[in-house]
Amino acid sequence: MAALLASQSCCYGGETARVTKAIGFSSSLENHFTGEATQCYGSKSKRFRIEMRQSELPSKVGINGRSVKMVPASEVVKRKDGVNGSAGKGVNGASLVSSRNINGAASTLVKAPKKTTESYLPPPVEGVRVLPSDEGFSWADENYSSLQRSIDVWSFVISLRIRILFDNSKWAYVGGFTEEKQKSRRRETASWLRESVLQLGPTFIKLGQLSSTRSDLFPREFVDELSKLQDRVPAFSPEKAKRFIEAELGAPISVMYKEFEEQPIAAASLGQVHRAVLHNGEKVVVKVQRPGLKKLFDIDLRNLKLIAEYFQKSESFGTNDWVGIYEECALILYQEIDYINEAKNADRFRRDFRNINWVRVPLVYWDYSAMKVLTLEYVPGVKINNLDALAARGFNRSRIASRAIEAYLIQILKTGFFHADPHPGNLAIDVDESIIYYDFGMMGEIKTFTRKRLLDLFYSVYEKDAKKVMQNLIDLEALQPTGDLSSVRRSVQFFLDNLLSQSPDQQQTLAAIGEDLFAISQDQPFRFPSTFTFVIRAFSTLEGIGYILDPEFSFVKVAAPYAQELLDLKQRQRSGTQLVQEIRKQADDARSSTLSMPYRVQRIEEFVKELDSGDLKLRVRVLESERAARKATILQMATMYTVLGGTLLNIGVTFSNQGSQLVANGSFIGAGIFMLLVLRSMQRVNKLDKFEKMI
Ligand SMILES: Nc1ncnc2c1ncn2[C@@H]1O[C@H](COP(=O)(O)OP(=O)(O)OP(=O)(O)O)[C@@H](O)[C@H]1O
């Protein structure tokens, strides 16, 4: 039967295919069945030939090593009669019937589920909400206009820009500026941002979630609000989901799945998850991508690229590599809608944990998966933060907390392939207390050479050697080796001396350390590659989960054996060739500095002589006063623009009252231009203020 399904020639792909070999859903099935009919799921109707053959084996080992229930060959031959259009009997739990296609046109061969009242699906999932429909959202309509979408995106960006400008401008606070007022305004803007992002749909929700990991780029209030963006996107209809699956997998739902649950168990920005049962009885989940997502991404990312380029050019957005950040986000977004990539990730992750029996990773059903549809083994569990359900099952919460961290340490330190989004929705606990991972769309990889550098960083942190820490950060490209790094060294030394030397009772949480790191990085030439920010965020999320599960939880305790193992490793390395190398290097350093010393003294003497004789002149620039003068000029210009803008506005109003609308409009436009110039000047002043604070 599998061959029948796979060999169907159909209209999904938009072209007639004629497949007679037994490719298919499960290579363990050797069914081969022959028939001929007309098949159509789109507007065109096509002829196709079906072959079906089945071995005499009553059962075989299928995917996942489980047995596959099969219908005897004789039975299949009997049922072959149904192919020619007459209502058929069931084959492997489904029946072949003649019916009309979705357009009500040509006769179509579909496989209808066997009429049965018994459901093969497990009992309904607890806590699944009835999700609202996505109808009514402009982005949910696959045929939205690209122009309208671009207008929506730009309106949002411009509104955000103006709001931020007002939040940061002291003159925009009626009754005087205070930090409290600014914080409360920022919170308002952040909450407006979250709502707008939800309205803008999938691309922006996903980007919002990604931004919530970047405390190094965005203000605290924004990061807090964006991290609340739990994919609250409405679900799309089951009809839409089923049509999409059929188009992607190239066969009718009833042919592929014995049962398909219409109500999704989860809906997210990029897709939704339905439970289903395969014809061999295996319980699966089908992750279906939101139709039209690629088109939406294309439009949105085109606009976002322009925005990133503008940010990059504009002084007021700092020195961040906005185009680089955009490219990173675009890569992640496109990767997330490539379910083949997710399936490969799941397979690799499953392989990495094959010897650890307390971690479960769902098996991928490759034959039922494609770019936009992913079928996975159904592995239900209690969400890791659902304390009541965990307690009801008598699970050991402290052990779960330790295991969650340990599993992550294994990913970072041993396999180098890590889950970049371990939020509580993606972690569950199985009946045997093992940890289940879901969602492999966003995975990170720490390549061997990066891992080696990270270990060096770890050792230098352990030795509290600020210079080495900085060199390792430069090697990791997390720090730019430009300009005067003495202030960076002081920050690093402060970090090493204060934050890492606390006794266990003073120990800070990882989240707090991460925040401190980002705070330091805001004033320094640090550039945290997204891999690090993901790792830091992942650890602080897991640490948070750890505290929820067990108030006594200590990250340090769980990580200690791993750290010790690494230090032992280093010690063993040092005892060998490295020690010899180190001694040789020290000898070299001593020799070269002894040799160069007289030359250096001579150079200093020459400088002093040149100064004495007046041959060498020192030109001193007082940068502070230069900046102050520049600021005064900008403010002067801003005042002039305000006066001119106000005057034109008055003239406009006067002319408008007198009925000379043309002149009035001209004046209004002029006033608008001057107002924009005022905003621009304020931006530049802010930028100078910020710069002054940094140095
Ligand atoms: N193999 C599985 N077995 C049981 N339930 C699953 C399985 N895969 C996913 N789920 C359920 O569906 C939910 C959403 O799945 P998943 O996270 O993979 O989707 P997503 O679209 O990537 O969502 P998000 O972006 O929010 O992480 C999970 O939290 C889990 O409850």
From Swiss-Prot:
Following inactivation of the gene, the phenotype reported is: Larger plastoglobules associated with thylakoids characterized by VTE1 accumulation and high tocopherol content. The pale green double mutant atsia1 atosa1 accumulates ferritin and superoxides, exhibits an increased nonphotochemical quenching (NPQ), and have a reduced tolerance to reactive oxygen species (ROS). Lower levels of the highly unsaturated lipid digalactosyldiacylglycerol (DGDG) and of different forms of monogalactosyldiacylglycerol (MGDG) and kaempferol. The abc1k7 abc1k8 double mutant accumulates strong levels of oxylipin-conjugated MGDG and DGDG.
Question: Protein transport: present as a keyword of the record?
Answer: no
What's in the keyword line of the UniProt record?
ATP-binding, Chloroplast, Kinase, Lipid metabolism, Membrane, Nucleotide-binding, Plastid, Stress response, Thylakoid, Transferase, Transit peptide, Transmembrane, Transmembrane helix
Expression sites by tissue: Mostly expressed in leaves and flowers, and, to a lower extent, in roots.
Q: Which residues bind ATP?
A: I265, A266, A267, A268, S269, L270, G271, Q272, V273, K287
Q: Which residues form the active site?
A: D421 (proton acceptor)
Topological relation to the membrane, as annotated? Multi-pass membrane protein
Pfam families reported in the protein's UniProt record: ABC1
Q: Which domain of life is it from?
A: Eukaryota
Q: Which InterPro entries match?
A: ABC1_dom, Kinase-like_dom_sf, UbiB_kinase
**What's a GO biological-process term for it?**
response to iron ion starvation
Which locations, inside or outside the cell, does it occupy?
Answer: Plastid, Chloroplast thylakoid membrane; Plastid, Chloroplast, Plastoglobule
Catalysed reactions, as listed in the record: L-seryl-[protein] + ATP = O-phospho-L-seryl-[protein] + ADP + H(+); L-threonyl-[protein] + ATP = O-phospho-L-threonyl-[protein] + ADP + H(+)
Q: Record keywords: Cell membrane included?
A: no
Q: Which GO terms describe its molecular function?
A: ATP binding; protein serine kinase activity; protein serine/threonine kinase activity
| Family in the record | Belongs to the protein kinase superfamily. ADCK protein kinase family.
Function summary = Involved in resistance to oxidative stress. Influences responses to reactive oxygen species (ROS) production. Regulates plastoglobules formation in thylakoids. Together with OSA1, regulates iron distribution within the chloroplast and mediates the oxidative stress response. Together with ABC1K8, influences chloroplast lipid synthesis/accumulation and modulates chloroplast membrane composition in response to stress.
Q: What is the protein name for this chain?
A: Protein ACTIVITY OF BC1 COMPLEX KINASE 7, chloroplastic
Please name the source species: Arabidopsis thaliana (Mouse-ear cress)
Starting at the broadest rank, the lineage of the source organism is: Eukaryota, Viridiplantae, Streptophyta, Embryophyta, Tracheophyta
Coding gene? ABC1K7
